[in-house]
Amino acid sequence: MNIFNNNLHETDKEINEIIKHEKLRQSSVIELIASENFVSPAVLEAQGSILTNKYAEGYSGKRFYNGCEEVDKAENLAIERVKKLFNCKYANVQPHSGSQANQAVYLTLLQPGDTILGMSLDSGGHLTHGASPNMSGKWFNAVSYGVNKKTYLIDYDEIERLAVLHKPKLLIAGFSAYPRNIDFTRFREIADKVGAYFMADIAHIAGLVATGEHQSPISYAHVVTSTTHKTLRGPRGGLVLSDDEEIGKKINSALFPGLQGGPLMHIVAAKAVAFLESLQPEYKSYIKQIISNAKALASSLQERGYDILTGGTDNHIVLVDLRKNGITGKLAANSLDNAGITCNKNAIPFDETSPFITSGIRLGTPACTTRGFKEQDFVSVGHMVADILDGLKNNKDNTKAEQQVLHKVTKLIKLFPFYD
């Protein structure tokens, strides 16, 4: 058998069908998962290229394998482009994920048992910032900060109090569900006060930072981590940035050979393509549209009587607090899914329900903005979401509302392009 003549349809009909059905699903739903986006065909092409065949342990010019001349060029391009994008001196584009980017920082700056201070999960933080089930919560003495009980905004005075009390080796800024801007200047001031390193995880807001729509942490944080998907609209992966090149050298060693073996060169190449796309003028317009769309979505839900956490949003995330409505996040997300609107259940600060149930939902605008949605479209989406939530308040069986909204979703989504 000559494998070079085989295509997916001939080789594996089952996987081929799964991909076809997933493409149909993605094309026909309103995608509101805040951490998802649609990459360009160019990114897909690079990610599915023959670079997947190449093993390239090490770094450009210092590989443990021969034959790396072309993949060296690809990695060098990715590094130079992302350094230009974020205006920084150091970048590592090899992390397989944002989690591994964070782990590389921990391996560089910490010893087991050191104290870290990060945002709690229920306040919008990420697993890798010290949550007890995660290695960051098992290997280190993890202390958590939260948000103000009245405003649901980050309480910087509380962070400072905890930092003075616990003397963390590392202070972490970043979130997976927080709709407001972060004051990186204040974080660095707190870190300096207690002699801590400061790490900014900008996985969700990387696109906003790159385009100047959010304060950049590069001048304040000792090290910055991010994913390359979400608002950067690249392949799934991670990266590490810094203006401290000495820390950068240590991070290189921590990542390889400390955490990973060979980098995924097809992913690195796809990252390079995404970074090039992000350097184009139209990308700034895209990020501005993401934010405008999120504000429109939040306002439309507020007009329908739903509580938006913090009263609005500064970024791409809208958090809906359903506690006063007697609806769980799980029930809402499942009913929306039935109606062709995909989002995720999400904990609300000081949430007393299980993380598998939750009292809220998280909505995001990057994916549908990529498809061309504008403010008026997200106003319509907000009303569709509210129709489903209204139905859940009044009926145990929400089939009627789901069918009505699904018809509207189908009509709207057909107006916007998808992959051929």
Curated annotation (Swiss-Prot):
The modification N6-(pyridoxal phosphate)lysine is found at residue 230. The record marks 229 as: Plays an important role in substrate specificity. This is Serine hydroxymethyltransferase. Disulfide bonds: none annotated. GO terms for molecular function: glycine hydroxymethyltransferase activity; pyridoxal phosphate binding. PANTHER family: SERINE HYDROXYMETHYLTRANSFERASE, SERINE HYDROXYMETHYLTRANSFERASE 1. (6S)-5,6,7,8-tetrahydrofolate binds at residues 121, 125-127, 246, 354-356. It is found in: Cytoplasm. Its cofactor is pyridoxal 5'-phosphate. The keyword Repeat does not apply. GO terms for cellular component: cytosol. CDD domains: SHMT (cd00378). Keywords: Amino-acid biosynthesis, Cytoplasm, One-carbon metabolism, Pyridoxal phosphate, Transferase. The keyword Cytoplasm applies. GO terms for biological process: glycine biosynthetic process from serine; tetrahydrofolate interconversion. Homodimer. Its EC number is 2.1.2.1. Belongs to the SHMT family. Pathway: One-carbon metabolism; tetrahydrofolate interconversion; Amino-acid biosynthesis; glycine biosynthesis; glycine from L-serine: step 1/1. It catalyses: (6R)-5,10-methylene-5,6,7,8-tetrahydrofolate + glycine + H2O = (6S)-5,6,7,8-tetrahydrofolate + L-serine. Pfam families: SHMT. Catalyzes the reversible interconversion of serine and glycine with tetrahydrofolate (THF) serving as the one-carbon carrier. This reaction serves as the major source of one-carbon groups required for the biosynthesis of purines, thymidylate, methionine, and other important biomolecules. Also exhibits THF-independent aldolase activity toward beta-hydroxyamino acids, producing glycine and aldehydes, via a retro-aldol mechanism.
